[in-house]
Swiss-Prot record:
Species per Swiss-Prot/TrEMBL record: Parasynechococcus marenigrum (strain WH8102)
Protein name: 15,16-dihydrobiliverdin:ferredoxin oxidoreductase
Keywords annotated in UniProt: Oxidoreductase
Tagged with keyword Coiled coil: no
NCBIfam families, per database record: PRK13247.1
One example of a Gene Ontology biological process annotation: phytochromobilin biosynthetic process
Catalytic activity field: 15,16-dihydrobiliverdin + oxidized 2[4Fe-4S]-[ferredoxin] = biliverdin IXalpha + reduced 2[4Fe-4S]-[ferredoxin] + 2 H(+)
Length: 235
């Protein structure tokens, strides 16, 4: 289901000079004991970004997942990029979240960085985020203009591919524009806010239970704290 999205994302990363770097040992790939699901992850070093991770879960007709988060360099205060796509094939159910994830919620920051996402929100009403996500506070590390959908095969086949391509293009554009302007948040504060994002997300990540059910608690705990949100590890 999501292989074309994965290819588009990683082709774009490589076109921007992205270099694949090593995932923590034992976390780059896993297969469930029953052999019915596999998970594979990639970590990219991309100019302008300190960390860009990608994960693909394939559990056949039961579940397909594509997840990615991009962390800009600390001297850039623009939003993180968050992608979370889930397809439950047996139920023909799509859950999609595409967002520029803000470090802060003040008006000046949002005015500087969110014109592109606002345009996408208007262009793709099927993914306009009116249904609030249940696991997260939409006022912290999520924007009011996120593309969010609980839909079916029509959204998965028609709306999502176009929205995904437009979303990636808009985020690259945001990054290029932000790189030309001085940041309003200091590098030290960007680091603190990105680390707080990891802690916040690790505490609330709805996928952790999903990964645990497929790959066991020990592996999934490592995956959560060492790969998905490494700043959440205890000091």
């Amino acid at each position: 289901m999501f292989d074309p999205f994965l290819e588009e994302l990683q082709t774009g990363i490589q076109a921007r000079g992205g270099i694949s770097v090593e995932v923590p040992a034992g976390l780059e790939h896993n297969q469930s004991q029953k052999g019915s699901s596999t998970i594979q992850s990639w970590l990219w070093q991309v100019p302008g970004f300190r960390r860009w991770r990608v994960t693909r879960l394939d559990a056949g007709d039961s579940l397909q997942v594509l997840n990615s988060v991009a962390y800009p360099d600390f001297d850039l205060d623009h939003p993180l990029m968050g992608v979370d796509l889930l397809w439950f094939g047996a139920r023909q159910k799509l859950v999609a979240v595409l967002d520029f994830q803000p470090l802060v919620q003040d008006k000046d920051y949002l005015d500087r960085h969110f014109d592109g996402l606002k345009d996408l929100n208007a262009r793709f009403p099927d993914l306009n985020g009116e249904e609030t996500m249940r696991s997260f506070d939409p006022n912290q590390y999520f924007s009011s203009w996120l593309l969010f959908c609980r839909g079916g095969s029509e959204e998965a086949d028609r709306s999502l591919p176009k929205a995904f391509s437009a979303f990636l293009k808009a985020y690259w554009g945001l990054h290029d524009e932000a790189s030309k302007e001085p940041s309003s948040i200091s590098p030290g504060d960007v680091e603190r806010l990105q680390n707080a994002y990891d802690v916040y997300s690790a505490e609330r990540d709805p996928a952790h239970g999903l990964f645990t059910s497929h790959f066991g608690k020990e592996w999934s705990d490592r995956f959560l704290h060492e790969f998905l949100f490494p700043a959440s590890q205890p000091a």
